[in-house]
Amino acid sequence: MKCEMTMKPTRRTILAGALAPLAARLAAQSPARPIERWDRFELQLAGPAEGNPFLDVRFSAEFRQQHRSVQVDGFYDGGGAYKVRFAPDAEGEWSYVTRSNRRELDGQTGAFLSSAPSARNRGPVSVRNTYDFGYADGTPYFPFGTTCYAWTHQPAARQQQTIETLRQAPFNKMRMCVFPKWYTYNQDEPPVYPFPRSAQDQNDYTRFVPEFFHNLETRIAQLQSLGIEADLILFHPYDHWGYALMPPEVDDRYLRYVVARLAAFRNVWWSVANEWDLVKGKKTADWDRYFRILQESDPYGRLRSIHHSGPMYDPTKPWVTHVSIQGDDFAKIPEWRAAFRKPLIFDECKYEGNIPKRWGDISAREMTRRFWLGMANGAYMGHGETYLDAHDILWWSKGGVLHGESPRRIAFLRGIIESGPAEGAAPVTGAYYPCIARAGEHYLYFLDFHQPALADFDLPGGRFTAEIIDPWAMTITPAEGTFSGKFQLKMPGKEMLAVRFRKT
């Protein structure tokens, strides 16, 4: 006869049984590995798919570490999936609790560990020392950007080709549109639209298409892996689908959705518009509102700018972090630095190319000259390329491959700038030739079109070595001896040279 014994439940076993589902849920909601500081933690929960979750469901989370609390908006990703992304800015344990107007999404709790960043993770870029930029870990960041407006709206193979081109290119910032673009050399339908679109070309602005944003996120992550900042253009006038003419409430909802999805990527910058003054139907008050939405919705304070065609949007407004400039009036750099007291980036100083447009037909030599002249006056520069192509595959719009000769020269300049003072260099007021310097330590002059056989210089006390730099030939030639005070330096007598002095 078999005898079975039944154990009487204890308080401990009852409590363990009650907590088991909670423990399992927390384990499922916590990452298996720590999240690096400044990287992305992502929580995904299952929720309602019926109705219109984009409008009907509110979802967010509060992240806590000791006395700190950070509120982060979540978003609906389709298929009943709700996500919230968070980029921890401190190491250690973080806890969270979700908030929602739907019971199944509300009050979900969990925790994760933030670990030390890896060697390639320097954190997000922000303004430092008024006119410059730096990574969160203290490393200086000198922007050397390029433009590919519609590269993420191309066939997948071309998008990947663009990534492979960038892998070998000198650029560490990419200007790119969120919305597709319709303009000369770029009149193609995108593979996916940001909003559902009917056969009659009507947009359903009450919903988003998650697949559109999945692709964008993949490309932003690839840029991050290459050390490239993604300068995302949120609005532009070159429209074919109605995105430049959306009602105000749709504009606002779009901005909040984009911030919820993308702000946790540490390499994201916000460019509120490309050529803001050409976007018809929007007033200055609208652009002010967009900036305020970014400020209020973005818990990380990513960099914010706005690009112009003619008149600038007022760069002194507090929500503008740096000045995005179209043009080549480098003589105004000292005036703008004094007036705006913010970093200046000539994101568009015209493009290397040969198209029948004045903005897209400068030579590689002239692009190289503009990079040197702008930087020697205290600004940062941006590249673009517009060479005619039988299939209209121009880098400036669609990406693909680079054909020009300026990128190699830009790489050469970037190496010179990044090997300079870690604290950066400032323009020297009243210098005979444009010059940026770390006073008493390091001087970089650009002689532009001047071609002296003997060049006059005036350095402070101490001794300095001199090097003659040819930006086009990409050579650095040491001069014999050391120099101090007022003197003449023997030069090759050719234009577009630079001279670097470093204290011995």
Label each PLM-derived region with a short phrase.
Residues 29-67, 72-75, 113-116, 434-435:
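Non-catalytic, glycine-rich low-complexity segments
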Residues 122-332:
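Active-site mouth of glycoside hydrolases
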Residues 83-86, 485-491:
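Exposed aromatic-hydrophobic patches
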Residues 3-21:
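N-terminal secretory signal peptides and thylakoid transit peptides that target proteins
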Residues 353-355, 367-478, 492-503:
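Aromatic- and carboxylate-lined catalytic core of secreted/periplasmic carbohydrate-active enzymes
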Residues 317-390:
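Catalytic-core region of carbohydrate-active enzymes that cleave or remodel glycosidic bonds
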Residues 72-128:
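Extended acidic/polar, glycine-enriched regions
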Residues 67-73, 473-480:
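Surface-exposed loop/edge segments in extracytoplasmic proteins
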